[in-house]
């Protein structure tokens, strides 16, 4: 159990009764808004071609059961003196590799003394000692029940029904233009790739590629994404925000105090909460999500702006282990912002429990943080950065303390950059690399401008800079200049010594002269580095005291 305990005033029975009634109204208000809305779907087609992998003892009995209804192929991982006779293909395989999803699995295997073989299958029953597909979230159509007989029986029963056409929602939307994964071959943000428990997101050069067939809909990628380039679409953040806003409005109207949302999944988390009965504190409002990793600081800030005294996120142990670390990091960032604005906390609680008595204890110590004096009326946007702007503007306007800026931990999606002016040559590589439009050139003048509001701290500018002149500075600024283009560096322009046209900066030319002075290509021609590109070519093509044929004397 991972919870943050805080001391709270003794329970007032009268107020607790009001809270319970107000919670009932809040739940009804949230339920009146659909949890989902129509979405784009992803389709699968399965004809039932089934691959069973395992030892003869483990695989053949289950293959026999499946073969009565499905076309089966078996790969045995142990040597056989005599190959078992079956009405379906049985082979011995030393190595087996499987990849894919329902209706589109590709398997490669090699039998002793034989070349590598391959086949396509719709379903896979993996009874091998180590799973062939190791991802935490398994692809649809892939079953690896381990050694538990009940789990194997359940898997086989499910597989018998997996023939036909199937569909699921497309859980994500991706805007390549704002993705901070890479620019010009330089790598920046890989948060979504690293967090995905289904291995559905891959590097694709300067962008990412999301496989909708592997995506399991956890939404952790959208929580980790600093720009909002990848967003959760089932449900979108705007719909979750509507449910929160409606619930809090009804809770306030019912006389409830200090409301806290407990975000849970609709299956295991909901079942755990249902076991609490009257032990559930009146001010705790359960709110089901498709997955508990699908919300982060944008939705949480909005909830606090709407009047929520806290957010508890319930993990039941079935989630990928990296999700807890992600949510903990998000809570650290969010609490740093609220604390810096003078909102006494804590406001956030990460619960990792699998028993109702543990959950009851944890929720009795649910957050009771300070909230704005006036609840916000804005609606969440499906664009993450817009929602953050709305929420932070409201929180700052009503904040007990109004600092110019709040220091944030590393990994926060807000901040500035520091430029070493002595090292920076104003080559503008960083401007071309910035995916968020935070860095801008001088429109012909040798200067570097920066809009802090746009910066997502992806680090592409720092990794691109050839002079290593850029350092990230995570923080959240509330100064008016945050949305303005401020000059980080400027230099006097350098004019071509031949045509007098500006073509760079004095510092850039001096750096080139220092680095290339001893280069044989410029031996005796260093002045060419002081020329613009056109004049440099002209100078190279002009004759230098060469003897012309016409100048030769005839005898």
Q: What kind of region is each of these model predictions?
A:
Residues 205-209, 444-449, 486-490, 510-529:
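Short linker/helix segments within small regulatory modules
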Residues 1-29, 202, 206-240:
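Helix-enriched interaction subdomains in cytosolic or periplasmic regions
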Residues 260-293:
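Mobile, glycine- and charge-enriched loop segments
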Residues 1-71, 75-195, 199, 258-271, ...:
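Ferredoxin-type iron-sulfur electron-transfer modules and their immediate structural context
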Residues 282-285, 308-309, 316, 327-357:
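Long C-terminal interaction/binding lobes of large macromolecular proteins
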């Amino acid at each position: 159990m991972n919870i943050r305990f805080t001391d709270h005033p003794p329970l007032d029975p009268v107020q607790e009764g009001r809270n319970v009634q107000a919670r009932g109204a809040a739940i009804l208000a949230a339920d009146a808004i659909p949890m989902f809305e129509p979405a784009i779907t992803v389709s699968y087609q399965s004809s039932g071609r089934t691959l069973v992998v395992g030892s003869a003892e483990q695989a053949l009995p289950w293959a026999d059961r499946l073969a009565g209804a499905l076309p089966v192929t078996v790969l045995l991982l142990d040597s056989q003196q005599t190959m078992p006779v079956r009405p379906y293909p049985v082979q011995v395989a030393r190595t087996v590799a499987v990849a894919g999803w329902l209706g589109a699995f590709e398997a490669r295997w090699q039998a002793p003394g034989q070349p590598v073989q391959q086949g396509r299958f719709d379903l896979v029953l993996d009874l091998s000692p180590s799973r062939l597909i190791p991802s935490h979230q398994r692809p649809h159509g892939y079953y690896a029940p381990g050694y538990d007989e009940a789990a194997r029986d359940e898997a086989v029963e499910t597989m018998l029904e997996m023939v036909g056409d199937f569909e699921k929602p497309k859980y994500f939307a991706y805007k390549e233009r704002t993705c901070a994964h890479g620019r010009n071959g330089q790598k920046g943000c890989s948060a979504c790739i690293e967090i995905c428990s289904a291995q559905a997101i891959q590097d694709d050069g300067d962008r990412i590629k999301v496989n909708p067939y592997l995506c399991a809909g956890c939404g952790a990628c959208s929580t980790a994404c600093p720009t909002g380039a990848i967003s959760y679409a089932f449900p979108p953040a705007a719909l979750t925000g509507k449910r929160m806003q409606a619930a809090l409005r009804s809770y306030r109207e019912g006389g409830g105090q200090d409301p806290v949302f407990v975000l849970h999944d609709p299956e295991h988390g909901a079942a755990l909460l249902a076991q609490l009965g009257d032990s559930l504190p009146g001010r705790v409002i359960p709110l089901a999500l498709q997955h508990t990793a699908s919300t982060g600081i944008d939705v949480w800030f909005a909830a606090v702006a709407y009047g929520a005294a806290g957010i508890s996120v319930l993990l039941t142990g079935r989630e990928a282990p990296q999700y807890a670390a992600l949510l903990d990091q998000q809570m650290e960032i969010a609490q740093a912002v609220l604390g810096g604005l003078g909102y006494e906390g804590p406001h956030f609680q990460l619960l990792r429990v699998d028993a109702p008595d543990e959950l009851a204890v944890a929720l009795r110590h649910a957050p009771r943080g300070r909230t704005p004096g006036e609840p916000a009326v804005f609606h969440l946007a499906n664009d993450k950065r817009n929602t953050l702007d709305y929420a932070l503007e409201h929180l700052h306007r009503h904040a007990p303390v109004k600092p110019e800026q709040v220091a944030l931990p590393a990994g926060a999606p807000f901040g500035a950059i520091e430029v070493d002016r002595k090292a920076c040559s104003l080559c503008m590589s960083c401007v071309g690399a910035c995916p968020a439009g935070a860095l801008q050139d001088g429109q012909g003048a040798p200067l570097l401008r920066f809009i802090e509001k746009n910066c997502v701290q992806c680090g592409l500018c720092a990794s691109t800079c050839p002079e290593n002149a850029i350092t990230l500075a995570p923080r959240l600024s509330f100064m008016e200049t945050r949305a303005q283009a401020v000059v980080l560096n400027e230099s006097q322009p350098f004019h071509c010594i031949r045509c007098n046209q500006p073509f760079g900066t004095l510092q850039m030319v001096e750096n080139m002269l220092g680095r290339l002075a001893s280069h044989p290509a410029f031996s005796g021609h260093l002045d060419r580095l002081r020329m613009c590109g056109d004049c440099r070519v002209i100078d190279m093509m002009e004759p230098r005291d060469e003897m012309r044929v016409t100048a030769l004397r005839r005898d």
